[in-house]
């Protein structure tokens, strides 16, 4: 990748392919390509549900505890469960070590992720209880909030929590005038705009959408469609990860 100290790196280059100019990203991906994605559920033995999700160099682990008795008791609701979320970036997750104390950004993201999950968890099945969701970013290379909500949704499913749908997320960015899917950290740093999106695909509902920067109306529509297509791929990977775990478990039980 071109660019010396203090210079903006070359993030988009143009190549001739089959007589057409094609945008190539700094890591070799096409604009509509996701990074390599890995998912695994049931990774923590002491949690009721857990999941590890990797989007390229971004790694997030999520753990779910509950439904369990709400403490303190006065926070319990008579008709449904309360959902508590904690999004946290490990001090070693970034190049510059961060303080262990929650930052304003982490508190805000914990809130928006909780609101997205509340839309799919059938909490009325668990009155007077609490469901605690912890998301820890182990390594940050862009798209941490969308990887976190994807991992949290998988961990809830792994815990057997009833849900209307899974939630999957991805971030779209505008880099050097080109809309690109699943931006990494360097693209995020230099993007003219970035738009994290999370959806419940089978319900066709957008549960999280944030826009940093400026997009025209046409660009916004195209970015949302790009996110939708990427989320469908991620959603299929979520279902595959759950099937893999429970098929393996049933085979072991029948052995």
From Swiss-Prot:
KW Nuclease (keyword) present: yes
Keyword line: Cytoplasm, Exonuclease, Exosome, Hydrolase, Nuclease
This enzyme's EC code(s): 3.1.13.-
Pfam family, one: RNase_PH
GO biological process: gene expression; rRNA catabolic process
Domain of life: Archaea
The keyword Nuclease appears for this protein: yes
Enzyme class: hydrolase
GO molecular-function terms, A-Z: 3'-5'-RNA exonuclease activity; RNA binding
Intracellular or extracellular location(s): Cytoplasm
Cellular component GO terms held in the UniProt record: cytoplasmic exosome (RNase complex)
Protein family (similarity comment): Belongs to the RNase PH family. Rrp41 subfamily.
Subunit structure: Component of the archaeal exosome complex. Forms a hexameric ring-like arrangement composed of 3 Rrp41-Rrp42 heterodimers. The hexameric ring associates with a trimer of Rrp4 and/or Csl4 subunits.
Functional summary from the UniProt entry: Catalytic component of the exosome, which is a complex involved in RNA degradation. Has 3'->5' exoribonuclease activity. Can also synthesize heteromeric RNA-tails.
Entry protein name: Exosome complex component Rrp41
Native source species: Hyperthermus butylicus (strain DSM 5456 / JCM 9403 / PLM1-5)
């Amino acid at each position: 990748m071109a660019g010396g100290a203090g210079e903006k790196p070359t993030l988009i280059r143009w190549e001739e392919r089959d007589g057409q100019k094609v945008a190539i990203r700094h890591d070799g991906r096409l604009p509509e390509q996701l990074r390599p994605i890995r998912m695994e559920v049931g990774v923590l033995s002491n949690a009721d549900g857990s999941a590890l999700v990797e989007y390229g160099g971004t790694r997030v682990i999520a753990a779910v505890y509950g439904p369990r008795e709400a403490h303190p008791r006065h926070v319990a609701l008579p008709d449904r469960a309360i959902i508590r979320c904690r999004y946290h970036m490990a001090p070693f997750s970034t190049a510059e070590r961060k303080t262990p104390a929650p930052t304003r950004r982490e508190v805000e993201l914990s809130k928006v992720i909780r609101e997205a999950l509340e839309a799919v968890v059938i909490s009325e099945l668990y009155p007077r209880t609490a469901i605690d969701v912890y998301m820890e970013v182990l390594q940050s290379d862009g798209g941490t909030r969308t990887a976190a909500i994807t991992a949290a949704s998988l961990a809830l499913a792994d815990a057997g929590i009833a849900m209307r749908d899974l939630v999957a997320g991805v971030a779209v960015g505008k880099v050097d005038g080109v809309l690109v899917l699943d931006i990494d950290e360097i693209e995020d740093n230099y993007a003219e705009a970035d738009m994290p999106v999370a959806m419940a695909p089978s319900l066709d509902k957008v549960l999280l959408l944030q826009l940093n920067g400026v997009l025209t109306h046409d660009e916004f529509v195209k970015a949302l469609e790009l996110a939708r297509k990427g989320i469908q791929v991620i959603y299929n990977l979520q279902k595959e990860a759950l099937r893999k775990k429970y098929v393996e478990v049933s085979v072991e039980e029948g052995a």
